[in-house]
From Swiss-Prot:
<keyword id="KW-0732">Signal</keyword>
<comment type="similarity">
    <text>Belongs to the non-disulfide-bridged peptide (NDBP) superfamily. Long chain multifunctional peptide (group 2) family.</text>
</comment>
<keyword id="KW-0964">Secreted</keyword>
<comment type="function">
    <text>May be an antimicrobial peptide.</text>
</comment>
<feature type="signal peptide">
    <location>
        <begin position="1"/>
        <end position="24"/>
    </location>
</feature>
<dbReference type="GO" id="GO:0042742">
    <property type="term" value="P:defense response to bacterium"/>
</dbReference>
<keyword id="KW-0929">Antimicrobial</keyword>
<dbReference type="GO" id="GO:0005576">
    <property type="term" value="C:extracellular region"/>
</dbReference>
<protein>
    <recommendedName>
        <fullName>Anionic peptide clone 8</fullName>
    </recommendedName>
</protein>
<keyword id="KW-0044">Antibiotic</keyword>
């Protein structure tokens, strides 16, 4: 009996936390595949305004272009 109550409580807590996560971070569930396209159009002012996460994405994009594996995706 206790284990059923514990499982139900765990399931409800997961559902509630998932609901609040989607309400707090709705953009995290949107597909943003054009982020790399946005990095193609950077100028000096844009580079100065980049967040650390953008710099990581820019570095990953540059490494992907430099790698030999990139040719396999074309």
């Amino acid at each position: 009996m206790v284990s059923k109550s514990l499982i139900v409580l765990l399931l409800v807590s997961v559902l509630v936390s998932t609901f609040f996560t989607t309400e707090a971070y709705p953009a995290s569930y949107d597909d943003d595949f054009d982020a790399l396209d946005d990095l193609d159009d950077l100028d000096l002012d844009d580079l100065l305004d980049l967040e650390p996460a953008d710099l990581v994405l820019l570095d990953m994009w540059a490494n992907m272009l430099d790698s030999q594996d990139f040719e396999d995706f074309e």
